[in-house]
Structures are given as C-alpha cells and as structure tokens.
Swiss-Prot record:
Pfam entry (one): CxxCxxCC
Family: Belongs to the UPF0260 family.
Annotated coiled-coil segments of the chain: none
InterPro entries to which the protein is assigned, alphabetical: Puta_zinc/iron-chelating_dom, UCP006173
Protein name: UPF0260 protein Spro_2751
Source species of the chain: Serratia proteamaculans (strain 568)
C-alpha cells in the first residue's frame, strides 16, 4: 500500500466523495456572504457569515441539511469548481486543481485545525452572524488581494 497521501496521487476528478469532502479545510470562506453588483457583476466580500456556520469552530451546524436550510449555500463540485474564482489561494480544491501542494497547516497535513486557527486562515476572527446584521453594506470588506 502506498504511503503517498491521496491528494498527491489523484486528480480532483479521481477522488472518491469521502476524499473530496476531506479536502475542505473548513476555513469558512465559502460561508461568508458575498454581494453582487447587479450592473457590473462585481463581487463584494462581506464578513457576514451564514447563520448555519458555527463561527468558533468554522463548521456548519447543519451540514447534512444545509441546502434545505440555506438556498444560497455553495456546493463545490468537480463540475462547477472553476466558476468559483473568488476562492482563496489557500483553498485545497484550488491548490490541487492547480497542481500545487497543500499548506503545512491544512488539517490533512497537520492533523488538526489548530494550526489553521493559529495562522488566522479561518474566518472566526472576522465573521459576524447573518441574523445580527442590519445593513450588509456596512460589512463589505475590501476585496481580498487573492480574489481574481
């Protein structure tokens, strides 16, 4: 049996569903709401987290039912991955798709999310709950430098 991790052996298309799911580092970026300018299609990043996101752990409170509970919940698939060009350069799906290695803090490499939180990769230090926000425009952040 090979000691080489699956993400170094397989393309995204070759991964099982379990392998695909395990690539997600749980940073929470997908769970922050984005606003889209209707005239220009420009994406505005906010720090407003979906109410299903547990901000402290950066995990979905209702992962199995997320699409029922949140109609705008994002589902990354092999087929639509390239349409999410706002994903951060740290995103494992993006990294593997570009033939790059995972970072040392990624839970598959480090064994836990502690290193991610320590490096401030997760959104827990910036996120606010959607249900607590009155005016989303007050929560627009500058477009991250990594956004294409």
């Amino acid at each position: 049996m090979s000691q080489t991790p699956f993400w170094q052996q397989k393309t995204l298309a070759e991964m099982s569903e379990q392998e695909w799911e395990s690539l997600c580092d749980g940073c929470g970026q997908c769970c922050l709401n984005k606003l889209i300018d209707e005239d220009t299609d420009e994406i505005y990043f906010t720090n407003v987290a979906c109410d299903q996101l547990n901000i402290k752990s950066c995990q979905c409170r209702n992962y199995e039912r997320r699409f029922e509970l949140e109609e705008d919940c994002i589902k990354l698939t092999r087929e639509n991955l390239t349409t999410f060009d706002w994903l951060p350069p740290t995103c494992a799906y993006r990294l593997i798709g570009e033939g790059k290695p995972l970072f040392s803090w990624h839970p598959l490499v480090s064994g836990s999310k502690a290193a991610m939180h320590g490096e401030r990769i997760t959104v827990r230090h910036i996120a606010v709950r959607e249900s607590e926000v009155v005016d989303w425009q007050d929560h627009i952040m500058n477009k991250p430098s990594w956004a294409r």
